[in-house]
Amino acid sequence: VKMSKSLGNVVNPDDVVKAYGADTMRLYIMFIGDFEKVATWSDEAVKGSKRFLDRCWNLMDMASDSEALSEKNEAIIHKTIRKVTQDIDELKMNTAIAALMTMVNEFYANGLTKGDLKMLMLMLSPFAPHMVEEMWELTGEAAKTGTMAMQQPWPEYDESKTVASHVEMAV
């Protein structure tokens, strides 16, 4: 469906920002698809973007105090750094966000450390900068580094760590 004032189906971005926040609007616009293609607006999908950001926020309460990457999450973190880096370079924001969603699901399944959460915050920062800066402050990273999350260097992946150290197989 094409948006048009004459059809009365235009979405006012101010209303979306007021209801869900600027980061949700920003994330949703980047998630709905390629910038060069027509995309269909979906209020339900906007709510899904908000749920994803809420899930990221709630990870702060789950993270253990370790600054190291957890063994269970190390491979998915390095795969995600590789994927998000490549996708941003190719302006494929939707697939970069999808990779972050997959990683967050793994964090919920495996648990996470503060080190794992820090990697998520750094990769999520271009998509939800306001929320990430709040998280950066609340997790003590701002005090520890003396910088904002957006001032940190982009994380680098180690190709050798993109493969899981062990695989469980049903017999």
What are these regions (language model features)?
Residues D15-V171:
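Helix-rich, typically C-terminal accessory recognition domains appended to large enzymatic cores
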